[in-house]
């Protein structure tokens, strides 16, 4: 992993300059690993060993003195398709890498490709409960959503399960979000991490003009109403899109990280921002080369000044840094 140190140090120097003497909430994000490698086998002739990049995430968390780490889903269950025993091996490696992090908790927001063949209930819940044992996380029993309070920095971090039902968010989860957002202590801010971007601009080209799911619209309206009434949401962080996006909608900051998935030219909307090159593992030019680089975003929130920043580690470097108010 030493070859990635230069990327971490480059981002850290930019973060340090922005941070100055201010206290802030810090968390590195990784998403859409879509790993094709199980043990030492190559599946479907695609050598795509991205799970090990969680170790880069862990190194970044330690270097930045992070408050937690976030994985926004789609780690590689069914793209390419795997047999049940391979999925179990893949999950074991996922947990092993995350468990080795010196920074806890690890907030995992399951993606649409994580729910194949019941993988989420079978492995995810138990695995991350063990990893985060002892952390002050509030989550309904047997659910894959909840929140983590960082009391010293007055920040509540929600992690959501946006593929819980056919309607994306169950009524129970929606009620949980609403009640615990509006009941935050005075002066606190909220951060949300989840797999899917709920904005239209986060969708692929063929979905751009389809109606948005009702619960996406409903959730955005909840966020916007909270902000209109004086509440503070630092940002909504997601993956899934496979391209970079930053959008302020009705006073709410949305950030989508490109991650490792890749997107073909015909599927990328005109506004999509991409760090890309020819990728030998995929034999196409729609992703960066994960054998030579990495793609991790480090988010930082100055809760005392209502400022947010995102610093790119790896592909694209400072080109994809963002600073904004909330």
Where are these regions (language model features)?
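Active-site glycine-centered loops adjacent to acidic/histidine catalytic or metal-binding residues
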Residues: 32, 73-74, 111-112, 195, ...
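N-terminal active-site segment of His-dependent metallophosphoesterases
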Residues: 1-85
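Extended active-site neighborhood of metal-dependent phosphoesterases/phosphodiesterases
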Residues: 3-19, 80-184, 218, 222-224, ...
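Acidic, His/Gly-rich catalytic cores of divalent-metal-dependent hydrolytic chemistry
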Residues: 303-326
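Active-site-proximal beta-strand elements of phosphoester/diester hydrolases
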Residues: 24-40, 154-164, 193-195, 252-259, ...
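Active-site-proximal segments of metal-dependent phosphoesterases and phosphodiesterases across multiple
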Residues: 42, 87, 170, 174, ...
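Short, solvent-exposed loop/turn elements at domain surfaces
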Residues: 35-41, 166-169, 263-266, 318-321
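Surface-exposed cleft-lining segments at the edges of enzyme active sites
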Residues: 36-44, 75-82, 158-168, 203-210
């Amino acid at each position: 992993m030493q070859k990635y140190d230069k990327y971490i140090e480059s981002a850290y120097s930019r973060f340090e300059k922005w941070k100055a003497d201010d206290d802030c909430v810090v968390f590195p994000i990784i998403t859409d690993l879509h790993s094709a490698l199980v043990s030492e086998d190559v599946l479907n002739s695609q050598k795509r060993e991205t799970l090990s990049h969680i170790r880069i995430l862990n190194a970044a968390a330690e270097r930045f003195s992070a408050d937690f780490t976030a994985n926004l889903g789609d780690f590689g269950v069914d793209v390419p398709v795997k047999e049940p025993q391979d999925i179990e091996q893949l999950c074991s490696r996922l947990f092993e890498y995350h468990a080795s992090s010196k920074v806890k908790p690890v907030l995992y927001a399951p993606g649409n490709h994580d729910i194949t063949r019941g993988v989420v209930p079978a492995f995810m819940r138990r695995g991350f409960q063990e990893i985060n044992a002892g952390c002050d996380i509030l989550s309904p029993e047997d659910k894959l959503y909840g929140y983590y309070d960082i009391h010293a920095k007055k920040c509540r971090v929600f992690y959501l399960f946006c593929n819980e039902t056919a309607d994306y968010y169950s009524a129970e989860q929606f009620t949980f979000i609403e009640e615990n957002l509006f009941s935050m202590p005075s002066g606190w801010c909220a951060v949300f991490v989840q797999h899917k971007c709920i904005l239209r601009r986060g969708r692929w080209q063929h979905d751009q003009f389809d109606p948005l799911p009702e619960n996406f619209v409903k959730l955005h309206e909840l966020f916007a109403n909270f902000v209109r009434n004086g509440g503070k949401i630092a940002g909504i962080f997601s993956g899934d899109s496979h391209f970079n996006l930053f959008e302020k909608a009705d006073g709410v900051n949305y950030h989508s990280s490109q991650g490792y998935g890749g997107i073909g030219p015909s599927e990328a909307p005109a506004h999509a921002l991409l760090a890309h090159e020819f990728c030998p593992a995929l034999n196409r030019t729609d992703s960066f080369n994960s054998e030579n680089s990495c793609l991790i975003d480090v988010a930082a929130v100055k809760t005392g000044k209502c400022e947010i920043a995102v610093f790119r580690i790896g592909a694209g470097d400072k080109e994809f840094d963002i600073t904004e108010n909330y």
